[in-house]
Structures are given as C-alpha cells and as structure tokens.
C-alpha cells in the first residue's frame, strides 16, 4: 500500500505541474487575445480529479493488491501519462486545462492530434479507469468514469464549439503540420 500512496503522490505532483503549465500557457494565450470558454464547468473538473486521488487512497485501504490487475493497470497509467505529455508538448503554449482559443491561430494537427481529435481526454479516461485499479479500487474507478463521462460530454461540446467559432471567425485558418 505504501508504494501506491507514493504513486498517488507522484500523480498529484504531476497534476500540480500541469496546473503550473496551464497557468503559464493561459497567460500566453490571453496576452494574444485568447478567449476562455466553459469557465463554469472547470471547478467541477478540478474537484473530480481531486476526488479521484482521494478515492484511490481511501478505497485502497480496504482492497488487496492483485498483481495481474495492478501491474496491467500501472502500465495503462504510464501510457496515459505518456499520451498526456505528448499532447502538452504537441500543443506547446496552446495546451491548457482550460478551454482558451486564440483567434487567428490554426488548429494543431501534429503529434497525437493527427490521430485523435481529443487525445488529452483519451489520456484522462484511461488514467481515471486505470489508476484506481492499480490497487483494485473498483468503486473509485467506476464512480470517476461515470462522472467523468458526464463532464467530458459537456467539456468536449464546449471545446468543439469554441474551435468551430475560431475557425468560422477566420475562414483562412488551416492546420499546423
């Protein structure tokens, strides 16, 4: 269990690094005329991700470590982290935990964005399911996955609307390769 708590602390530290990156990138985007969308649902996303970590820690106390499940889930968590940071690196200063669109910038179609429309959310789904299962916290995995599906539905609609608005506001926008 101690190593699992250390894993959760590492994931929490990674989340803090994400928030620092997002804060810096938000300043970059807003300084270039960026507009934020979906501000009202952002606190629910932050709360859900905090609850994921707390739920993992609390439920793992009552669950055994099952090696076949745990090691497989840990590999999925590592893959999800890799995908997430590939997204961050591919978007550069345009990556954010918030939906901020800078008018006049073309859509990014490099890195994982050439394969998936929303690869960062794929990483979130994978991690939200796998991280609890590393230590058999299936109630947390199920609860997070269901609540996350509701939030992602709102979030993806918001992001798609924002990106559509940005494209139609400037019909000359192309794709970054």
Report the location of each language-model feature.
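N-terminal signal-anchor/start-transfer transmembrane helix
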Residues: 8-23
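A generic secondary-structure signal marking the coil-to-beta-strand transition
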Residues: 9, 43-44, 50, 75, ...
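Cytosolic-biased juxtamembrane loops and peripheral soluble domains of multi-pass membrane proteins
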Residues: 22-40, 64-177
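Long, highly hydrophobic alpha-helical transmembrane signal-anchor segments
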Residues: 40-69
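Feature marks short, highly hydrophobic, charge-poor N-terminal signal-anchor/signal peptide-like helices
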Residues: 1-6
